A protein has these predicted regions:
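Conserved small/polar residues in nucleotide/adenosyl-binding loops
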Residues: 126-132
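Conserved alpha-helical segments that form or flank metal/cofactor-binding pockets of metalloenzymes
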Residues: 62, 69, 79-111
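Short, conserved phosphate-binding/catalytic loop or strand-edge motifs used
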Residues: 112-118
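Helix-loop segments that flank and shape redox-cofactor active sites
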Residues: 29-46, 61-80
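Alpha-helical scaffold segments that form or flank carboxylate-/histidine-based iron centers
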Residues: 45-56, 75-90
Length: 135
């Protein structure tokens, strides 16, 4: 696949991660065995606001890792960025699940967070030639 095709695929992923209610995970939801929340409206609203910020961070992490993976020159670096992005998908899924539990939505700015982070990741790795990333 050429660079343009890869870039188009990444745009598609970005839209899915930032707009869809992504809930596919490889690890169990950490709150699955916790009792039902008995939050009043103020607590629920505050919790949802905090979770929306957390969700935005997870969307941005996807963009950063995906951008770095796209432009990394070394295959090992690309693999590590792909693996990091894959691990972060669980966090994104958990944030979506919690927002659903709180009857809330993610930020409308999620596509912007993804796009800006993707751009930063792509630009940062275009010029780096480090042999490995610290583990």
């Amino acid at each position: 696949m050429n660079l343009v095709d890869k870039f188009i695929c990444e745009i598609d992923k970005g839209l899915k991660f930032s707009m869809d209610n992504y809930q596919k995970q490889s690890r169990d939801y950490p709150a699955k065995d916790l009792p039902e929340d008995n939050l009043n409206e103020t607590e629920r609203s505050h919790s949802a606001s905090l979770m929306r910020v957390n969700h935005s961070g997870e969307v941005a992490a996807q963009g950063l890792y995906r951008g770095q993976a796209l432009t990394a020159r070394l295959e090992g670096t690309r693999d590590k960025m792909d693996r990091a992005a894959q691990e972060e998908l669980d966090h994104l899924s958990w944030c979506n699940k919690r927002l659903d539990e709180l009857n809330e939505r993610p930020s409308f700015l999620s596509p912007l967070w993804y796009g800006l982070s993707f751009g930063m990741g792509a630009v940062s790795y275009t010029h780096l030639t480090l042999p490995t990333i610290a583990e």
